[in-house]
Amino acid sequence: MNTLKDLKIGKTARVIKVHGEGAVRRRIMDMGITKGVEIYLRKVAPLGDPMELTVRGYELSIRKEDAQMIEIEA
């Protein structure tokens, strides 16, 4: 299973599924990361956390632990 955490800088991927439960999953989906949406990885902080993404035309930063819950198709 490929997750958003595995995506390389400068690449685009499509979300297949958002894993997790409860408030964490809801928060990810509230940020606009839902099934079928395209995500572009702009950059990653020097220590790998957080990751800066472009989602639905806006900039978004998420933690690696949240990125692991997002299954992608590169």
Regions inferred by a protein language model and the residue ranges of each:
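Compact, glycine-rich, soluble single-domain proteins
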Residues: 1-74
